[in-house]
């Protein structure tokens, strides 16, 4: 139905349309009244958030939560903090500084955030956060408390009174042995200089003896247990270490040292004139005066096959004992009356080895109560040639030579005889 209304005029009989009030044009000077649009109800929309916690520079396994949006614009950091406080306790989120992962140019970066900052999604509605552990302001102002709370603690900081006297630690020098090919011992066993000199000397001797082939254990005489104890003040500024000379390396198959070379070296050491006990302390001689197994073996086989021509000056002029390379040990000069006393002196200076009644060697190398059976016999021509070179010898010389060849036991009868002569 049309809204127009026709009316008749008296002048002319035709109809004129009439406009309604709704369609009347308003004047342009009149302002329109703005009415506020209706607010849509806010729906509790949740978005997924993945966050990492960084402790000591390492990222933990990722955590997943759902955060409710408080604004239509998107996610804010305060929404995440409120959610973490509800789930993991109040103050948990304040222990970390938060940053969000976002795209930047052709890659991704961590965008540091404050509490009121907007969080940009990575892709679509994907949010990734990282929480880095922060230090408290009181810990930063007090560095001592920072050291106590850190995971790497100094044990001396826990007891400052105990460690105030010895602030300077003992110096420990370590030496790497590069000449051993079979066994690679990276470090020697070392001891601090704060120990007493007696204890450190015993430990060094024990450690050195375990690294040699001398495994035998013998009961030490009472005289050898008495040692001079030096003042510990002379060892204050010295570091105790085992050098390469003090430890004999383990034997190897490729070692050029043969049995003959070892015996010659022992011959040079043993056949010297009588000196002080400190002069004989070498690699083959222990500090207590006893000898190594190689030196004892040299004494057993020295009266026959091995030659000592290359051992240097071996003539003992003071005692009257001379060694011949082929014939063994013979007494060349000396009075016949005190022959036994001279032999005793020679045996005491010959290596200074004193055998006891209960003393034994590893492997039962020698038994003092049994006679040694010669393994090899010389031919008659060799014996004749040797006799022609040596010249005539008396029976006394032969008896004394045989007596000097063997290693006697403890000279008890001689001592008793001397005591009887003095009384």
Swiss-Prot record:
GO cellular component term of the entry, any: plasma membrane
Topology in membrane: Peripheral membrane protein
Chief location: membrane
Amino acid composition bias (Basic residues), ranges on this chain: 406-415
GO term, biological process aspect, one: regulation of root morphogenesis
Tissue expression summary: Expressed during embryogenesis and in roots.
Presence of the UniProt keyword Membrane in the record: yes
Keyword Membrane: yes
Keywords, alphabetical: Cell cycle, Cell division, Cell membrane, Developmental protein, Membrane
Region described as DIX-like oligomerization domain: spans on this chain: 45-136
Location in or out of the cell: Cell membrane
Motif (Association to cell membranes): 233-234, 303-304
Assembly and binders: Homodimer. Forms long polymer filaments with other SOKs proteins polymers (e.g. SOK1, SOK2, SOK3 and SOK4) crucial for polar localization and biological activity. Binds to ANGUSTIFOLIA (AN).
Listed PANTHER family: PROTEIN SOSEKI 4-RELATED, UPSTREAM OF FLC PROTEIN (DUF966)
Record note on domains: The DIX-like oligomerization domain is required for polymerization, edge localization and biological activity.
Listed name of the protein: Protein SOSEKI 5
């Amino acid at each position: 139905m049309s809204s127009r209304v026709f009316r008749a005029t008296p002048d002319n009989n035709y109809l004129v349309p009439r406009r309604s009030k709704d369609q009347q044009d308003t004047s342009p000077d009149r302002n329109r009244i703005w009415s506020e649009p209706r607010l849509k109800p806010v729906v509790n929309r949740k978005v997924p958030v993945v966050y990492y916690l960084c402790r000591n520079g390492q990222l933990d396994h990722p955590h997943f939560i759902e955060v409710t949006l408080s604004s239509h614009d998107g996610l804010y950091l305060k929404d995440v903090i409120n959610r973490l406080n509800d789930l993991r306790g109040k103050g948990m989120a304040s222990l970390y500084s938060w940053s969000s992962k976002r795209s930047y140019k052709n890659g991704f970066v961590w965008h540091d955030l404050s509490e009121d900052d907007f969080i940009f999604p990575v892709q679509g509605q994907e949010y990734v956060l990282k929480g880095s552990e922060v230090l408290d302001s009181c810990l930063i102002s007090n560095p001592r408390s920072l050291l106590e709370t850190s995971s790497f603690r100094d044990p001396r900081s826990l007891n400052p009174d105990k460690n105030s006297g010895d602030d300077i630690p003992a110096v420990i020098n370590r030496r790497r042995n590069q000449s051993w090919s079979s066994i690679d011992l990276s470090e020697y066993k070392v001891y601090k200089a704060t120990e007493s000199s007696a204890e450190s000397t015993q430990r060094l001797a024990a450690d050195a003896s375990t690294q040699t082939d001398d495994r035998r254990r013998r009961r030490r005489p009472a005289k050898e247990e008495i040692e001079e104890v030096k003042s510990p003040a002379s060892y204050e500024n010295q570091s105790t270490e085992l050098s390469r000379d003090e430890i004999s390396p383990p034997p190897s198959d490729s070692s050029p040292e043969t049995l003959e070379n070892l015996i010659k070296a022992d011959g040079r050491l043993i056949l010297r004139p009588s000196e002080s006990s400190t002069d004989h302390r070498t690699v083959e001689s222990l500090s207590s005066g006893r000898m190594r197994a190689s030196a004892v073996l040299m004494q057993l086989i020295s009266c026959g096959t091995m030659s000592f021509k290359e051992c240097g000056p071996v003539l003992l002029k003071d005692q009257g004992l001379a060694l011949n390379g082929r014939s063994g040990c013979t007494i060349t000069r000396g009075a016949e009356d005190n022959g036994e006393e001279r032999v005793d002196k020679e045996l005491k200076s010959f290596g200074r080895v004193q055998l006891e009644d209960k003393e034994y060697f590893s492997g039962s190398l020698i038994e003092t109560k049994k006679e040694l059976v010669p393994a090899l016999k010389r031919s008659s021509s060799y014996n004749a040639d040797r006799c022609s070179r040596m010249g005539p010898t008396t029976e006394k010389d032969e008896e004394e030579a045989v007596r000097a060849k063997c290693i006697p036991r403890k000279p008890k009868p001689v001592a008793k005889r001397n005591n009887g002569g003095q009384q």
